Amino acid sequence: MSEPVVDTAELSAEEKKRLLRERRQAKMSKGKATARLNNILSQGSSVKTSGVKSVLDQEKEATSSHDDDPEIQDITEITTPPPRTPPIGEDAPQDIDKIFQTMLQQQQQRGQGANTADDPFAQIMKMFNQTEGPDSLINEGSASTQDPTEIKYHQELLEYNTYNQKLWKFRFLLVRVLVTLFNFFYHYTSISDFHASNYAYVRDLSSEEYPVRDFFTWFATSEVVLVAAYYSVFHSLGLFHAANQNSIILKVMSMGSMILPQLESYKPLVARFLGYYELLGIVLGGLSLVIVLFGLLSFAN
């Protein structure tokens, strides 16, 4: 399309400059800016220069925008949190049981051929390495083993001993309660003066001098028989002394023996005392039930 013819007489000086500038830019945009520049620079010279290149003919570098969003974005990269990186100089966390196990093995290797009974560090490691519960049946050599089959066996044995101990305690408790209730209601129905009261004159109305003597005789006899059977069964099953290993007193003595080794010699005596104290607790429990029964009976009088 040809450019319109404009009468230059009617144009002002500013419009003429604008038209010249537009014509010059139109010529430059056709890719001949470099040739025209070299032609201008070569005027008046016998040698034409061709080493100059116009900025209009230079190729523009493609600029990449970092702010453009990708066409497809994987949401899992945003929703999945990155793995925790430990601080510099810090390794991955280890199992505390494995750490104590390794320290105990190293201490045992150092103490081979020497007496480590007075070594506080070795005693601390043994105390941490022992498993809680009635596991005194497990020797110290098996506690330091790494065989998974043997470890599983000891865990099952520990669970069985705990279950067996609770089962036998429940059985004896049930028998004691039934025997005491039968003894009480038998004498209550067979003896007319078998009653209790808060008032002295009511108790003095009894025709017999000791109306509850037979009841307490049978009660004491049954308690002695049940306590003896309890001790015999638990001792034969190996649960009598094992049940006291979790006592807070023995744990405190184990910790104190690291400072005072003499306490270690008193632990068997304390464990035996705790066992007999448990037998005494059985008798006290039966007496408590009798007191409750007589207290309920006193409301009727």
UniProtKB/Swiss-Prot annotation:
Residues 189-214, 300-301 are lumenal. It is found in: Endoplasmic reticulum membrane; Golgi apparatus membrane. Coiled coil: none annotated. The keyword Transport applies. Keywords: Endoplasmic reticulum, ER-Golgi transport, Golgi apparatus, Membrane, Transmembrane, Transmembrane helix, Transport. GO terms for biological process: protein insertion into ER membrane; retrograde vesicle-mediated transport, Golgi to endoplasmic reticulum. Residues 42-55 have a biased composition (Low complexity). The chain crosses the membrane at residues 168-188, 215-234, 279-299. Residues 1-167, 235-278 are cytoplasmic. It is a multi-pass membrane protein. Residues 56-67 have a biased composition (Basic and acidic residues). Pfam families: GET2. One of its GO terms (cellular component) is Golgi membrane. Residues 42-93 are annotated as: Disordered. Component of the Golgi to ER traffic (GET) complex, which is composed of GET1, GET2 and GET3. Within the complex, GET1 and GET2 form a heterotetramer which is stabilized by phosphatidylinositol binding and which binds to the GET3 homodimer. PANTHER family: GOLGI TO ER TRAFFIC PROTEIN 2 (PTHR28263:SF1). Belongs to the GET2 family. Required for the post-translational delivery of tail-anchored (TA) proteins to the endoplasmic reticulum. Together with GET1, acts as a membrane receptor for soluble GET3, which recognizes and selectively binds the transmembrane domain of TA proteins in the cytosol. The GET complex cooperates with the HDEL receptor ERD2 to mediate the ATP-dependent retrieval of resident ER proteins that contain a C-terminal H-D-E-L retention signal from the Golgi to the ER. This is Golgi to ER traffic protein 2. It comes from Candida dubliniensis (strain CD36 / ATCC MYA-646 / CBS 7987 / NCPF 3949 / NRRL Y-17841) (Yeast). The lineage of its organism: Eukaryota, Fungi, Dikarya, Ascomycota, Saccharomycotina.
